[in-house]
């Protein structure tokens, strides 16, 4: 009955758009079981469907059927249809006018079936039902959406990529499978968040009752917490707007704090002090989403917490490619609605939002944080090595990084403002010189930060006032590129070299460091950086300092206050050492076992000279060779890499020869590269020696460039991830040895850690730091028995890198 009713909806003589002129079968309606009340909507029939007269009967349909079956849905018991009912010529995407013409047919199908659950396949279906696009965005696919078309108002709606997209991009197969499984769970009622009851604590008696309840919780009680805040504690305008807690995931208690409409706006610090003993209980299992942030906030109010489970860190460890924000995770794992409610949480706006709306948002945060823990914990427990990494590295590492952020780095203000003035003068001279290379009529209004103006200057003919350069790279819109890679091609031109210098000095040195530092100092002359343990897919820490110049001109502004020394400890060539271990490269391993310098050996290999005859510049030139070719970089990319990162310039012939000599010197690296490429093509992921997983689905791409990048990532990710994990593990071990009255970690950058040590304790801590870093319990903790030694170089002085008198160094390399 239902089937014949649906068949009658089709009008095979339809002429509402031009598609009927090209289609073999006009007005193809859906197939499957309408009584299941599960509906899947694609875009339009393809060539095979047009020939057979049956939707989703081609290769895309085969993929869909297989994925549905894998997820526990019988493909014959769902109803599958399309937005557009006739095949567009050439299998192009349907146009808006075409799916508007077919709107009545799809609406009729929906009314006849009354689907409880709808899955949209591809951008056309997403646009048709939800009036939005961006199907590959994690905020649009695999999560519950709000339909804008009223005919779908009573349906659960989810979207994912079209199976035809998976055919073109095999690396998306995993994403597609996960979305189908999530949709299947939703149809079975397994994707349902527990509604969070919100308790707004607006009276002193209510607050006292809350504190009493927290204190009465049993041992091992799971408590989630979250704050909404503006700025950080060392900012003069810092404040916490509300604090929420939950111990069952169903009810969240939120205390309004500093806000114009808060009943406690004048007593918010006092209230937090009263919560201190209740929250600092060591027997509680504290859970947070990006808890390092919340802990820093609460520490500003005198509450010092160490949470046991971080939702964001767990999610990142399980899948580094997906979003880690709570909105996405609560939708993906719990089926929760998007709940931010249009709130603007930026520091300058948050106090203008209604306090009850902020508290309601905060309540959802703590409720869903609590509910997510068992889901992520279960996944971690199914992967023991990841669970160990989470428990032994990520969580304790988060607490150590939290303390580093709170301590901050000491800034010598006299140096900061002297350097700022010197740099401003130097940049002005550079811009004046660059203007001499252009017509007078351009000079006064010329903006070196304007892409169109710089493009005009670079690529206009000399007769018309430009430099007359030929563009070598183009943007997606077809315009000549002015980015660094494009401009590097002409760095022999004096004006281009000055432009590159200007960009480095103005945009990086000045705008990224000196100016923000000058306005961001706290009352103790410290700047506080932020580090993310989830910021890089390889597992590397990411933070504000990652791109800081190596020059002493900038770095020697950082140091230690009077009576203290700045101690810098760097791992020597740690990535090369890790690579030697993973690749089992015998020449490299032997060199490190004998205590040899690999950069010196490489310089000798490149020049044919004895060690005693190698100069400083020759060793410097060996560094990019060792690091660039380690992961299989090709000559052209290496040439730019060496120039950009090391200010070392190779001709193309030198690049090719250096690459050849490199792999002749280290023959086992080639076998390692081939092995990792084979592994990633078989599994679509690789695993580091410590157990960190790097998912690389793009290795299945039909685009060879994309595939090659995934293969390169398969080689370098385990090395970079392990090096970063070892650095974080060293920080954890070192923190146990530091007496805060005598020494403190104040920063980390790449392979190094910075400390402030009291002058009279430097002789004690320097050898201690070196010993801890070189003798980490990696085997005992992670089962990793490194086949090469770790070496740490430790030095101290009043300023960063042991520079005792950096005054008058000048802006090196830019004369």
Model segments located where?
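A short, charged helix-loop
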Residues: 39, 147, 153-165, 331-357, ...
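Acidic beta-strand-to-loop metal/phosphate-binding motif
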Residues: 116-122, 224, 283-291, 566-568
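Metal-dependent phosphoesterase core characteristic of DEDDh/y 3'-5' exonuclease domains
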Residues: 130-142, 157, 163-164, 248, ...
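A polyanion-binding, active-site-adjacent surface
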Residues: 1-190
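A common structural junction motif
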Residues: 648, 770-782
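Conserved catalytic core of nucleic-acid polymerases
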Residues: 399-406, 475, 522-524, 528-529, ...
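Structural signature of nuclease core domains in nucleic-acid processing machines
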Residues: 227, 237-290, 295-311, 756-771, ...
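Conserved "right-hand" nucleotidyltransferase catalytic core of DNA-directed polymerases
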Residues: 185, 189-262, 277-280, 306, ...
């Amino acid at each position: 009955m239902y089937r014949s009713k649906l068949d009658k909806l089709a009008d095979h003589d339809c002429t509402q758009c031009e598609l009927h002129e090209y289609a073999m079968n006009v007005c193809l309606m859906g197939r499957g079981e309408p009584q299941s009340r599960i509906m899947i909507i694609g875009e339009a029939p393809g060539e095979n469907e047009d020939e057979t007269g049956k939707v989703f009967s081609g290769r895309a349909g085969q993929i869909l059927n297989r994925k549905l079956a894998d997820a526990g849905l019988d493909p014959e018991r769902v109803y599958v249809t399309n937005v557009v009912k006739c095949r567009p010529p050439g299998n192009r995407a349907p146009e808006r006018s075409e799916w508007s013409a077919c709107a009545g047919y799809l609406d009729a199908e929906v009314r006849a079936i009354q689907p409880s659950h709808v899955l949209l396949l591809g951008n056309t279906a997403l646009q048709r039902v939800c009036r939005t696009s961006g199907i590959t965005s994690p905020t649009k696919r695999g999560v519950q959406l709000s339909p804008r078309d009223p005919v779908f108002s009573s349906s659960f709606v989810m979207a994912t990529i079209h199976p035809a997209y998976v055919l073109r991009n095999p690396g998306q197969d995993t994403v597609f499978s996960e979305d189908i499984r999530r949709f299947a769970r939703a149809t079975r009622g397994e994707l349902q968040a527990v509604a969070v009851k919100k308790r707004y604590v607006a009276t002193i008696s209510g607050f006292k009752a809350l504190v009493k309840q927290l204190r009465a919780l049993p041992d091992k009680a799971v408590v989630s917490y979250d704050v909404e805040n503006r700025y950080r504690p060392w900012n003069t305008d810092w404040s916490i707007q509300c604090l929420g807690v939950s111990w069952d995931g169903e009810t969240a208690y939120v205390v309004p704090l500093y806000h114009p409409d808060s009943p406690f706006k004048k007593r918010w610090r006092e209230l937090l002090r009263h919560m201190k003993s209740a929250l600092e209980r060591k027997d509680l299992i504290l859970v947070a989403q990006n808890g390092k942030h919340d802990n820093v906030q609460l520490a500003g109010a005198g509450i010092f917490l160490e949470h046991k489970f971080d939702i964001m860190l767990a999610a990142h460890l399980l899948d580094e490619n997906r979003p880690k924000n709570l909105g996405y995770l609560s939708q993906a794992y719990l089926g929760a609605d998007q709940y931010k409610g249009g709130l603007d949480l930026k520091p300058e706006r948050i106090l203008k939002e209604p306090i009850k709306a902020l508290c309601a948002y905060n309540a959802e945060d703590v409720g869903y944080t609590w509910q997510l823990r068992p889901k992520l914990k279960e996944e971690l427990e199914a992967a023991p090595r990841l669970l160990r990494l989470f428990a032994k590295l990520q969580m304790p590492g988060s607490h150590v990084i939290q303390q580093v952020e709170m301590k901050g780095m000491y800034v010598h203000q006299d140096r900061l403002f002297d350097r700022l003035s010197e740099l401003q003068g130097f940049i002005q001279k550079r811009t004046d010189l660059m203007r001499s290379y252009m017509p007078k009529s351009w000079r006064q209004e010329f903006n070196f930060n304007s892409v169109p103006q710089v493009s005009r200057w670079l690529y206009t003919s000399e007769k018309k006032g430009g430099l007359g350069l030929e563009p070598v790279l183009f943007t997606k819109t077809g315009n000549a590129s002015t980015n660094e890679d494009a401009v590097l091609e002409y760095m022999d031109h004096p004006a281009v070299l000055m432009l590159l210098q200007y960009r480095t000095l103005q945009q990086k040195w000045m705008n990224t460091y000196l100016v923000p530092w000058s306005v961001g100092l706290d009352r103790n002359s410290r700047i506080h950086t932020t580090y993310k343990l989830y910021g890089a897919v390889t597992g590397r820490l990411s933070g504000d300092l990652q791109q800081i110049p190596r020059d002493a001109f900038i770095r020697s502004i950082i140091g230690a206050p009077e009576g203290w020394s700045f101690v810098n400890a760097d791992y020597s060539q740690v990535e090369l050492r890790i690579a030697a271990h993973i690749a089992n490269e015998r020449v490299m391993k032997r060199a490190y076992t004998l205590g040899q310098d690999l950069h010196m050996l490489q310089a000798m290999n490149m020049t044919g000279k004895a060690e005693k005859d190698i100069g400083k510049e020759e060793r410097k030139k060996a560094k990019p060779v060792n690091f660039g070719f380690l992961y299989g970089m090709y000559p052209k990319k290496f040439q730019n890499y060496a120039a950009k990162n090391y200010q070392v310039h190779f001709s193309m012939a030198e690049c090719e020869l250096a690459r050849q000599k490199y792999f002749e010197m280290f023959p086992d690296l080639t076998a390692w590269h081939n092995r990792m490429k084979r592994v990633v093509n078989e599994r679509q992921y690789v695993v580091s020696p410590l157990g960190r997983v790097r998912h690389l689905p793009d290795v299945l791409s039909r685009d060879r460039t994309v595939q090659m990048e995934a293969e390169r990532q398969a080689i370098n990710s385990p090395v970079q991830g392990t090096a970063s994990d070892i650095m974080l593990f060293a920080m954890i071990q070192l923190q146990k040895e530091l007496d805060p009255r005598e020494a403190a970690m104040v920063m980390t950058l790449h392979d190094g850690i910075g400390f402030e040590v009291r002058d009279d304790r430097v002789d004690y801590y320097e050898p201690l730091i070196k010993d801890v870093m070189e003798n980490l319990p990696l085997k005992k903790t992670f089962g990793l028995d490194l086949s090469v030694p770790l070496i740490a170089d430790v030095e101290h002085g009043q300023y960063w890198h042991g520079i005792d008198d950096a005054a008058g160094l000048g802006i090196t390399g830019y004369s």
